[in-house]
C-alpha cells in the first residue's frame, strides 16, 4: 500500500474527502526559540524588505495618490468589530472572550487585497535591481525619479509574468504596468471576470486557462524561461513575495501599540488568516512569530474543497500531494483560495510555526459576508471571510490547544485578529450579488 493510500484511511483525511469542515491542530509546532534556528529566513531579511518599501514610498505616493496621506506606505486599518462579535456570539451560542479586530487588507490601496503587499514588493525589488544595474538610480536617490518617460521606456524593454487566481495578478499587473513593464497575467478558470477586465483596462496581457491555478503558474513559468528579459513572479516558491507579506507584521505591531493592545505571556494574540498557496498567510505568520514569538498563535483557514495547505502539512507530503489526489475538485467561490497544491517553500517553513488550520464551507463565506456588512458596514469578498469563525472554532474545537498551552485562563485578555484579505475592488453590482446570496442561504 503506498503512502497516499494509507493517508486516505486517516480519520481526518476521510472528513476532508467528504468536504466536511475540520479543525486541525499542528502536532509539529515548536517553541519559537527552537524553530527559528532551523528556518532559512531571518529577521534581517524582513527588515531589508521593509527598508526597500520605505525607499519606494516617494514613488508610490507620487504615482498612486490614494497613498498620499500615508506618505506612500501601502497599509490598511486595524479596526474593532464589536457588533460582528455580538452577532457571532448570538448565532453560535459561544462567547468570544477578549478583543475581536479585523485587519482590513480588503481596503489596502492600489489593488484592494493582501496581495498588494507581496506582489507589489517583489516587482519593486526587481525594478530597483534593474535600475541600479543600469545607472538609473542609486539607493540614496528619491525614488520618485522612476516616474519618468526615461525610466518607463527603459522598463518597457523587460517583461513580467505571473500565474494567478485573481488578486496576485491584479497587484502584479497594476504595479508592473505603472512602472512601464510589459506584463502577462496567466489566469486560472476560477478567476473572476471583473478582475480580468480590470487588468485589460490597464494594458495588461491576460491569458486565460480552462484548468486550475497550478496550470496557470506552470504556463507563466514556461513563458518566462523562454525569454531572458522576462521575470517570473513565482507564487509557489518566491522568497521575495513571502518577505513582502512578512513586513505586515512589523506594521501591525505599531498599530497594536497605538491602540494600547498588549501582547505578552498574559495577553495572547490569535490571528486567523485565509490560505491559498500560502505565501501571504505564511509570510505574515513568520513576521508575527519573529516579533511576538510564543505569544502569537496563527491559524489558517481554507475552503472545504481546497484544503491544500492543511493536507500538505497533515500528511507531511507538503507540495507532493494535491487535493485532487484525495478526490476533491478544488472548486470554490473563494477564488483566491482555489489552490490544489501548497507552496513548497511556505509549507515547510510553517511546519514548526503554525498552530493549526480549519476549513469552511462556501455557503458560510456568503452568510458571514452579509453579517459583517450588516453589523459593521464593511464589505469583503467571500474568500476574505474564511478566518471569521476562527475564534468560535478555537473554543469549540481547539480547547485542547488552549489547555496544553496554558491559555484557557488568559482568554479574557486575548486579542483575536481576523485578517480580511480582499474586497474593496469588487464592482458594486458583484458585491451586492454576494450580499443577496448571503441572505438566501439558510
Curated annotation (Swiss-Prot):
Which GO MF terms are attached to this record?
D-serine ammonia-lyase activity; hydro-lyase activity; pyridoxal phosphate binding
Among SUPFAM superfamilies, the record links this protein to: Tryptophan synthase beta subunit-like PLP-dependent enzymes (SSF53686)
The superkingdom of the source organism is: Bacteria
Provide the leader sequence positions: none
Q: Which UniProt keywords apply?
A: Lyase, Pyridoxal phosphate
The enzyme's E.C. designation? 4.3.1.18
Q: Give residues where N6-(pyridoxal phosphate)lysine occurs.
A: 115
State the top-level EC class: lyase
* One annotated GO biological process: isoleucine biosynthetic process
InterPro entries, alphabetized: D_Ser_am_lyase (IPR011780), Ser/Thr_Dehydratase (IPR050147), Ser/Thr_deHydtase_PyrdxlP-BS (IPR000634), TrpB-like_PALP (IPR001926), TrpB-like_PALP_sf (IPR036052)
Provide the reaction this enzyme catalyses. D-serine = pyruvate + NH4(+)
Q: Which cofactor does it need?
A: pyridoxal 5'-phosphate
What family classification does the UniProt entry report for this protein? Belongs to the serine/threonine dehydratase family. DsdA subfamily.
Q: What is this protein called?
A: Probable D-serine dehydratase
User: What is the organism field in this record?
Assistant: Halalkalibacterium halodurans (strain ATCC BAA-125 / DSM 18197 / FERM 7344 / JCM 9153 / C-125) (Bacillus halodurans)
Q: Which gene encodes it?
A: dsdA
Amino acid at each position: 500500500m503506498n503512502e497516499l493510500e494509507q493517508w486516505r484511511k486517516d480519520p481526518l483525511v476521510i472528513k476532508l474527502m467528504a468536504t466536511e469542515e475540520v479543525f486541525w491542530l499542528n502536532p509539529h509546532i515548536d517553541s519559537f526559540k527552537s524553530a527559528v534556528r532551523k528556518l532559512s529566513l531571518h529577521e534581517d531579511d524582513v527588515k531589508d524588505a521593509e527598508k526597500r518599501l520605505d525607499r519606494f514610498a516617494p514613488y508610490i505616493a507620487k504615482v498612486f495618490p490614494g497613498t498620499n496621506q500615508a506618505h506612500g506606505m501601502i497599509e490598511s486599518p486595524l479596526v474593532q468589530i464589536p457588533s460582528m462579535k455580538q452577532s457571532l456570539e448570538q448565532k453560535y451560542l459561544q462567547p468570544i472572550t477578549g478583543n475581536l479586530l479585523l485587519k482590513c487588507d480588503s481596503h489596502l490601496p492600489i489593488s484592494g487585497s493582501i496581495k498588494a503587499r507581496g506582489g507589489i514588493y517583489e516587482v519593486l525589488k526587481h525594478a530597483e535591481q534593474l535600475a541600479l544595474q543600469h545607472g538609473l538610480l542609486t539607493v540614496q536617490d528619491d525614488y520618485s525619479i522612476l516616474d519618468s518617460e526615461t525610466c518607463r521606456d527603459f522598463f518597457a524593454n523587460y517583461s513580467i509574468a505571473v500565474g494567478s487566481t485573481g488578486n496576485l495578478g491584479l497587484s502584479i499587473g497594476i504595479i508592473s504596468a505603472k512602472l512601464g513593464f510589459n506584463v502577462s497575467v496567466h489566469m486560472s478558470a476560477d478567476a473572476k471576470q471583473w478582475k480580468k477586465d480590470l487588468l485589460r483596462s490597464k494594458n495588461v496581457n491576460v491569458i486565460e486557462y480552462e484548468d486550475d491555478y497550478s496550470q496557470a503558474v506552470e504556463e507563466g513559468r514556461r513563458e518566462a524561461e523562454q525569454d531572458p528579459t522576462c521575470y517570473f513572479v513565482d507564487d509557489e516558491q518566491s522568497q521575495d513575495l513571502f518577505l513582502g507579506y512578512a513586513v505586515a507584521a512589523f506594521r501591525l505591531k505599531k498599530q497594536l501599540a497605538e491602540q494600547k493592545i498588549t501582547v505578552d505571556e498574559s495577553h495572547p494574540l490569535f490571528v486567523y488568516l485565509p490560505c491559498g498557496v500560502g505565501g501571504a498567510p505564511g509570510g505574515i505568520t513568520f513576521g508575527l512569530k519573529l516579533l511576538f514569538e510564543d505569544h502569537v498563535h496563527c491559524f489558517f483557514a481554507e475552503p472545504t474543497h481546497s484544503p491544500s495547505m492543511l493536507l500538505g502539512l497533515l500528511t507531511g507530503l507538503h507540495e507532493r500531494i494535491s487535493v485532487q489526489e484525495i478526490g476533491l475538485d478544488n472548486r470554490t467561490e473563494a477564488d483566491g483560495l482555489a489552490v490544489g497544491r501548497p507552496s513548497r517553500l511556505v509549507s515547510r517553513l510553517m511546519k514548526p510555526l503554525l498552530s493549526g488550520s480549519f476549513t469552511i464551507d462556501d455557503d458560510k463565506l456568503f452568510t458571514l459576508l452579509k453579517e459583517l456588512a450588516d453589523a459593521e458596514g464593511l464589505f469583503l469578498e467571500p474568500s476574505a471571510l474564511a478566518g471569521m469563525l476562527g475564534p468560535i472554532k478555537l473554543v469549540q474545537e481547539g480547547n485542547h490547544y488552549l489547555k496544553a498551552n496554558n491559555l484557557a485562563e488568559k482568554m479574557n485578555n486575548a486579542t483575536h485578529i481576523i485578517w480580511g484579505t480582499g474586497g474593496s475592488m469588487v464592482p458594486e453590482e458583484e458585491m451586492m450579488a454576494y450580499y443577496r446570496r448571503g441572505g438566501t442561504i439558510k
